[in-house]
Amino acid sequence: MKYKIPLFVLAAIVLAACSATSIAPTPTLDAVQQTGQAVYNLRCAQCHALAPDTVVIGPSMAGIATRAATRVDGYDAEAYIERSILVPKDYIVAGFVDTMPTNFGKELTSAELTGLVAYLMTLK
């Protein structure tokens, strides 16, 4: 009988770890989005976190696809994100300073830019 209590406790811990409050699964990325994720990890992650409410230097990218759709009248989320990469001085988020390199978008190939925008659009 003395071994059943620890086994019960272990089972309870395992079940608690498998609860419905776990983190949502990462969406499956297509090839274009994977290219963008690689660009993000290499060129963006040093300044932009993926965790909500986490500031490294620039604003967090958590939820950017949703927020970008409401930033500028006449721009959908993709257009806003692309423009903010190509001409970062045009759209500085309130509370942040203009530190994004102005030539950043010019250093990306067309495929890298398309991929980066596609990847950021998965961050809802």
Specify the residue positions occupied by each region the protein language model found:
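Axial heme c-ligation environment in periplasmic c-type cytochrome domains
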Residues: V55-I64, L86-L113, L120
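The canonical Cys-X-X-Cys-His
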Residues: G36-L50, L116, L120
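Electrostatic cytochrome c docking/interface patches
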Residues: S19-V39
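Disulfide-rich extracellular modules and peptides
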Residues: A20, Q46-A49, T102
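Short, solvent-exposed mixed-charge patches
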Residues: L123-K124
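Bacterial N-terminal signal peptides that target proteins for export
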Residues: M1-F8
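C-terminal motif of bacterial Sec signal peptides marking the signal peptidase cleavage site
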Residues: V14-A17
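Gly/Gly-Pro-rich "capping" loops immediately C-terminal to redox-active cysteine motifs
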Residues: Q33, Q37, A49-S84, K106
